[in-house]
């Protein structure tokens, strides 16, 4: 009898065990689609980014012109750039929904998978930040100046660290060239970390909406979930192409159509929409070091989530108090995102401070209390 190549070939076996014969819970919902969508986002970004890098010049005097040249003179350069810029937004939509799913259904109790996931988020944020600097428009260079300057809040070594990061005494040519190098390198680091993320996931198997062990009821990944994922791919690519073709600059900043002017500061320096929640938390604390610590804590708090789990149940499916808190947290993040896009004046300052306080209170205090209360009410 002939050997089944798919199950016996050293390389094919890895693919088979990850994408074809993988035992998967029979009841996972559409919320479990976002992992594979993130994979598609990453591939799309690497391909479009590679094509863009062939025409880009990492020099302060030429960067803006090279991006302009790409959009005007390169075959479909405008489309590749629009797909790349809007692909980043979709990447963040998918990753935020993916994290939200993990929080809601208790997937964070797979601690290794969760921790690698948080590291992936941090790497993605770094990649996107250095990428946003590359077109060298007004918001690019000033964004780089403001965000890198935050490192100067670190006591004793701060100023040295910033100058080392800049490669000089201000954001200039060395900064741009190193940011381009980082932006080229980091997506491949993300790809490597993704494999580690999947390795840890396949050690324990996927969680499911009920949060109960599903060993007794598994189905093969292919054809059931490969078809389900394919539907997700099609829908996401429709959204991406629609955005890139009909309204490519909707999520960008008009300031970035102006080449960098080091002597003229834009009226409102603000990051892209996906960083606004963290930016609002940074701005809500009047002290520089305090703001930087709050900014870091707003993302690093995800590492603490598994330690704050006090419920006897894994998922929030049957926990109404926690569900209310979870949706309150979603609303709070939307408010922070909105406040981050507004100027620093009354009433936005106080709204931002209250929303920042609520963000940390819900995660650190209210979630554990609600979980303990639910245990008590259900006599668990």
UniProtKB/Swiss-Prot annotation:
Cofactor details (free text): Binds 2 heme b groups non-covalently.
Q: Which UniProt keywords apply?
A: Electron transport, Heme, Iron, Membrane, Metal-binding, Mitochondrion, Mitochondrion inner membrane, Respiratory chain, Transmembrane, Transmembrane helix, Transport, Ubiquinone
Gene Ontology biological process terms, A to Z:
mitochondrial electron transport, ubiquinol to cytochrome c
Family annotation (Pfam families): Cytochrom_B_C, Cytochrome_B
Q: Gene3D superfamilies, alphabetically?
A: Cytochrome Bc1 Complex, Chain C
One GO cellular component, as annotated: respiratory chain complex III
Which positions does UniProt annotate for heme b b562 binding? 84, 183
List the InterPro entries hit by this protein, alphabetically: Cyt_b/b6_C (IPR005798), Cyt_b/b6_C_sf (IPR036150), Cyt_b/b6_N (IPR005797), Cytb/b6-like_sf (IPR027387), Cytochrome_b (IPR030689), Cytochrome_b_C_euk/bac (IPR048260), Cytochrome_b_N_euk/bac (IPR048259), Di-haem_cyt_TM (IPR016174)
Subcellular location per UniProt equals: Mitochondrion inner membrane
GO terms assigned for molecular function: metal ion binding; ubiquinol-cytochrome-c reductase activity
UniProt membrane topology term? Multi-pass membrane protein
Query: Which cofactors does this gene product need?
Result: heme b
- What else is noted? Heme 1 (or BL or b562) is low-potential and absorbs at about 562 nm, and heme 2 (or BH or b566) is high-potential and absorbs at about 566 nm.
- Assembly and interactions? The cytochrome bc1 complex contains 11 subunits: 3 respiratory subunits (MT-CYB, CYC1 and UQCRFS1), 2 core proteins (UQCRC1 and UQCRC2) and 6 low-molecular weight proteins (UQCRH/QCR6, UQCRB/QCR7, UQCRQ/QCR8, UQCR10/QCR9, UQCR11/QCR10 and a cleavage product of UQCRFS1). This cytochrome bc1 complex then forms a dimer.
User: Member of which family?
Assistant: Belongs to the cytochrome b family.
PANTHER family hit by this protein: CYTOCHROME B
Q: Report the function annotation for this chain.
A: Component of the ubiquinol-cytochrome c reductase complex (complex III or cytochrome b-c1 complex) that is part of the mitochondrial respiratory chain. The b-c1 complex mediates electron transfer from ubiquinol to cytochrome c. Contributes to the generation of a proton gradient across the mitochondrial membrane that is then used for ATP synthesis.
- Listed name of the protein: Cytochrome b
